[in-house]
Amino acid sequence: MLPSAESLEGKAIPNVVFKARPDDQWRDLSSDELFKGRTVVVFSLPGAFTPTCSSTHLPRYNELAPVLRSHGVDDILCVSVNDAFVMNQWKAGQDAANITVIPDGNGDFTDGMGMLVDKRELGFGRRSWRYSMLVRDGVIEKIFIEPEREGDPFEVSDADTMLAYLAPDAQVPEPVVMFSRPGCPHCARAKQALRDNDIHYTEISEDQKINTIVLRGVTGRMTWPQVFVGGALIGGADEVQAWLAGKA
């Protein structure tokens, strides 16, 4: 049986040493080094490369990391019962620069949290139950534990739930996506305007798969760039500048 949130809140996190490989060099990371005197968000998951972890759990924490940090969070840790090589390769493929991955290879931290569960029916051995927590100076202030039922529930340990607890009135930025063409001066102008306003964007550049036919099929237009914000088409460089002016 998993521990209750109430039984863990107000308690110190387990004092362990993680065998990590930052910069491809072995290094021991202690709980004190990660948590002492710091405000840290932790999310723990069953395994690197697994579907929910890769498609939703980690990417959303990475996306909301700047907002979490603007509300006093010093670091965001992803803990999993995997070795350092696996965790590093997973992070590299996830484009998750805002997240610190922590390999709990022997499960010592997870066991100390009471979250080590038997996943031998999947060939996983013992893994972490999915949860997230806010830790201040090594003490658990708030923890969100997924309901204990069959499968891999994902309802409360997500980044949005954590942000809502930490800063209920926080403004979550809409995702911004730009379809661009290499060498396009209007694309460069739109990108500079977004950067000048500290707006993060994802760029999809023209190549053999993303061409004018695709651009027209998605946007109904044939000129580059085309920028979307929160699923709505803003348009090209002039429209982006007008949209930014309207936000000022």
Language-model features, listed with the residues they occupy:
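Chalcogenol-based redox active-site neighborhoods
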Residues: 1-176, 181-212, 216-224, 233, ...
